[in-house]
Amino acid sequence: MSSGNLGQIFAQRASELREYIFSQPASNFENNPWALAGAIETFSNTKGHMMIFRDAKLAIAKEQLMAQQPAPRTILEFGTFVGKSALAWGAILRDIYGERVPEDVNVYTFDPNPQMVALARDLVKLAGIEDIVHVLEGPGSDILKRLYAEGKVASVDMAFFDHWEEFYLPDLQLIEELKLWRVGSLAIADNTDFPGAPEYLAYVKAGGNGTAGSVKYESKSYETQAGRGPVSAFLIPLLLLFVSC
């Protein structure tokens, strides 16, 4: 399937999701990002399959973030799509800190597609977490450089890679170059099996570039069952990296 056809399918699914969510009473989702993330999962299961970060994977990521010490303050997401995972990151941070989340606790999520950005912003606003989750339009590498230059991102506690797999490694290495990782930082990469990110996998499984004083990675893979029934069920690896500087 060509990228153009894939883009059309994504656009159609996003439009259908918007209609599905906003046809329901706003009170179902106001100030409740978990309910909204759950509704997106339900839509994908029942109305039209979408390439979202599924609940089974999210549960693993949530467990890691909830246990992280010190508690996470800055999360980067490369690839917003419709915003399901961004909603979840914001919800997790609110679960950690309570209703009064400190101003320096933020999720920055990046996507070059204006339709996806608009939808994600509307969903984040509906869920009442727009003070935590910032949906930014453009290539993640460019935006991260700007945020770093502006002093808005000084360290990264977790980075989530769920965009085009060919950019996983360059964007991981950009975080290294900007010296944003700390000991105990977490990186999560989705879809490392299919379509696949072989260069990224080789790099992180080798522990990094191997030079003295560089970031070193410890990787752990998980397999989760896709929730689409026994016929189409399959295992999906989720790669977590634990940074030791």
Residue ranges and their predicted role:
Residues 1-33:
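N-terminal auxiliary segments of SAM/dcSAM-dependent transferases
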Residues 7, 11, 108, 134-136, ...:
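General small-molecule cofactor/ligand-binding pocket signal
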Residues 28, 67-72, 93-103, 148-153, ...:
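Alpha-helix termini
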Residues 40-49:
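Active-site flanking loop/helix segments enriched in acidic
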Residues 49-141:
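SAM cofactor-binding core of SAM-dependent methyltransferases
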Residues 80, 132-195:
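Active-site segment flanking the S-adenosylmethionine/decSAM binding pocket
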Residues 88, 119-122, 145-148, 171-172, ...:
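Short, well-ordered secondary-structure micro-motifs
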Residues 165-245:
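C-terminal substrate-binding/active-site "lid" region of AdoMet-derived donor-dependent transferases
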